[in-house]
Regions:
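Ser/Thr-rich, low-complexity intrinsically disordered terminal regions
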Residues: 10-175
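Hydrophobic h-region of N-terminal signal peptides that target proteins for export
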Residues: 2-10
Length: 175
């Protein structure tokens, strides 16, 4: 029983629909599109060092395989730009009898210059329940915004859209 307690704590965290991290204001919009941006200051790091570090990370993280087509689609060391098309699964829940997940597609743009790395994630789309009659497709704008993914009081995540929002924010934080 004592061995299960840490696992129960982790499960509760994953399903905590009132965590402020996921509530109002967690989704940023740019020109009507869901966009996540993060700027990293790396004092003393040259553009070439940052570029090679980020290029190595992107090449390792985004590799196509027989099921997914994630890949680096553009690179220009002179500009300091790397563009990636991401494709992976977001797993909402997994048990021996069921698997609830969605495929997420997104664009990730990395721009580097001396001492700074800027990352932008946008053009986010989902393909949910793909094995059942072709599944359903959604864009982030119609599925994870405050209006769709939060309750009316904006104090907790909505039952269905909320899981997409939570997992998308967690993916953004991982990147």
């Amino acid at each position: 029983l004592m061995l299960c307690l840490p696992l129960m704590g982790m499960a509760k965290e994953k399903n905590d629909n009132t965590d402020p991290k996921y509530l109002a204001g967690a989704i940023t919009m740019t020109d009507g599109k869901v966009t996540f941006s993060k700027d990293f200051n790396v004092p003393g790091a040259s553009k070439s060092v940052l570029y090679s570090t980020m290029k190595k990370w992107a090449d390792g993280r985004f590799q196509p395989n027989e099921k997914m087509n994630a890949r680096v689609v553009y690179e220009n060391e002179t500009e300091g730009t790397i563009a990636v098309m991401g494709e992976e699964y977001l797993v909402f829940s997994s048990t021996a009898l069921s698997l609830d997940r969605t495929r997420i597609y997104y664009a990730l743009t990395i721009n580097v210059k001396d001492g700074q790395c800027d990352m932008t994630m946008n053009r986010i789309k989902y393909w949910y329940d793909e094995a059942r009659n072709g599944g359903e497709r959604y864009t982030a704008e119609e599925w994870i915004t405050d209006d769709m993914a939060l309750n009316k009081k904006r104090t907790k995540l909505a039952p269905i859209c909320g899981k997409f929002r939570r997992e998308t924010i967690d993916l953004k934080d991982q990147l």
